């Protein structure tokens, strides 16, 4: 087991920590909200009485976006976030660490089998609220979700940007942030990724979202990008 030499909070990403190991390598991590719990087999680091979970960029598109130079991490302590396509909770668990017990993640997932996996994660993570539903129809879970500070989407649907806009109009406050992981091949297998990205960005802009940054996630995820935007009502 590689020993931890030091842990410090990242200069720009609040709630994200840089772990230095004795072999000289650096890893990013979040402080574990549920000490002792692993979510996806990630490494656990212990230092000065605290426990940190390695944030694996090959398993989490948000971690990949940070390592690829996303201008900022808008997620912060106490935030309320709507997560579309939460799946089994890999990325959401790190967001859960960052927002802490005062924050809340409303996690929408369409697949019952995947939802069962998520339920094992949220049993101890009281700030994640799972919703079995279809992100295309936000009106069907409107009664379960309060207004949110942020929206994160990873739904791999052909109309992903339109789905995001629909949900943003329902739930995202003015000035709230949106992070959308986009896989070009899930939207249109016949079109080059750059053209797909442009088309989806136009849909977001037409829906009132001001684009702040777009980063491509190679080599962590081929043909993926992360779009960061802010809602302007």
UniProtKB/Swiss-Prot annotation:
GO biological process, one term: box C/D sno(s)RNA 3'-end processing
Subunit structure: Interacts with nop5. Component of box C/D small ribonucleoprotein (sRNP) particles that contain rpl7ae, FlpA and nop5, plus a guide RNA.
Keyword Hydrolase: no
Enzyme Commission code(s) on record: 2.1.1.-
Key words of the record: Methyltransferase, RNA-binding, rRNA processing, Transferase, tRNA processing
Summary of the function given for this chain in its UniProt record: Involved in pre-rRNA and tRNA processing. Utilizes the methyl donor S-adenosyl-L-methionine to catalyze the site-specific 2'-hydroxyl methylation of ribose moieties in rRNA and tRNA. Site specificity is provided by a guide RNA that base pairs with the substrate. Methylation occurs at a characteristic distance from the sequence involved in base pairing with the guide RNA.
GO molecular function terms listed in the Swiss-Prot or TrEMBL record: histone H2AQ104 methyltransferase activity; RNA binding; rRNA methyltransferase activity
Binding site for S-adenosyl-L-methionine: 90-91, 109-110, 134-135, 154-157
Recorded family membership: Belongs to the methyltransferase superfamily. Fibrillarin family.
Name of the protein in question: Fibrillarin-like rRNA/tRNA 2'-O-methyltransferase
Pfam families per the UniProt record, alphabetical: Fibrillarin
Record organism: Aeropyrum pernix (strain ATCC 700893 / DSM 11879 / JCM 9820 / NBRC 100138 / K1)
């Amino acid at each position: 087991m590689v020993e931890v030499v030091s842990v410090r909070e990242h200069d720009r990403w609040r709630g994200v920590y840089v772990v230095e190991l004795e072999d000289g390598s650096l890893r990013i991590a979040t402080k574990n909200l549920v000490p002792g719990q692993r979510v996806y087999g990630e490494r656990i680091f212990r230092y000065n009485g605290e426990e940190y979970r390695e944030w694996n960029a090959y398993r989490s598109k948000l971690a990949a976006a940070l390592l690829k130079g996303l201008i900022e991490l808008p997620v912060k302590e106490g935030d309320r976030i709507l997560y579309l396509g939460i799946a089994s909770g890999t990325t959401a668990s790190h967001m859960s660490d960052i927002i802490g017990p005062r924050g809340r993640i409303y996690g929408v997932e369409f697949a019952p089998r995947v939802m069962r996996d998520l339920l094992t994660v949220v049993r101890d993570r009281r700030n994640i609220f799972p919703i079995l539903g279809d992100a295309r129809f936000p009106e069907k879970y409107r009664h379960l979700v309060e207004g949110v500070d942020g929206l994160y989407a990873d739904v791999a649907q052909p109309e992903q940007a339109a789905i995001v806009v629909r949900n943003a109009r329902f739930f995202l406050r003015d000035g709230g942030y949106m992070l959308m992981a986009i896989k070009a091949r899930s939207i249109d297998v016949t079109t080059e990724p750059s053209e797909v990205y442009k088309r989806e960005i136009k849909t977001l802009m037409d829906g009132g979202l001001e684009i702040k940054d777009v980063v491509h996630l190679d080599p962590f995820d081929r043909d993926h990008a992360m779009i960061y935007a802010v809602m302007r009502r």
